[in-house]
């Protein structure tokens, strides 16, 4: 059953992974994304966090949901930086977002309203709870770079699907 909480920290980090990636994502690595979820599941990972941004985050959440039928105990948790995150999304993506939240095992809403740095706090929240971070990262500046670097500082395993797993490229 799904729970919606403002904050929860009762999971084992070693069995948890998070996703980060660019908003410009058109399914380029969907097969690799599903494969890495299966691989991590085989290594004991059961909980996957999505920050629910446009692009890679939504695709990653959908990949976890699609695999729940074949991977018992697989859980999707969504870290929502503030209510209304999707208000400015295109309508089709806003509907995807709502469908994902409805099917998520847990939704953590981290701030009552938009605040400066709320997206970075969301990224820190996910990384601090994760032993691995799966990325769609081209090496550029921005939120994905911040999360990628923060994962390194937190000693999380980093898997970059952009460069076929050669995560130390960036």
Task: Give the role of each language-model region.
Residues 7-170:
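Acidic/glycine-enriched connector segments
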Residues 2-6:
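Extreme N-terminal basic, low-complexity initiation segments
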């Amino acid at each position: 059953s799904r729970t919606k909480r403002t904050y929860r920290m009762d999971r084992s980090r070693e069995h948890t992974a998070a996703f980060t990636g660019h908003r410009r994502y058109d399914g380029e690595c969907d097969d690799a994304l599903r494969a890495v979820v299966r691989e991590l599941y085989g290594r004991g990972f059961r909980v996957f966090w999505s920050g629910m941004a446009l692009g890679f985050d939504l695709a990653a959440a959908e990949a976890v949901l699609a695999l729940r039928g074949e991977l018992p105990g697989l859980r999707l948790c969504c870290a929502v930086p503030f209510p209304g995150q999707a208000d400015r999304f295109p309508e089709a993506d806003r509907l995807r977002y709502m469908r994902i939240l409805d099917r998520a095992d847990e939704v953590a809403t981290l701030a009552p309203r938009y605040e400066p740095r709320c997206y970075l706090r969301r990224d820190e929240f996910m990384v601090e709870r994760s032993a691995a971070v799966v990325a769609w990262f081209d090496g550029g500046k921005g939120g994905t770079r911040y999360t990628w670097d923060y994962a390194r500082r937190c000693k999380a395993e980093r898997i970059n699907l952009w460069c076929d797993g050669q995560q130390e490229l960036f």
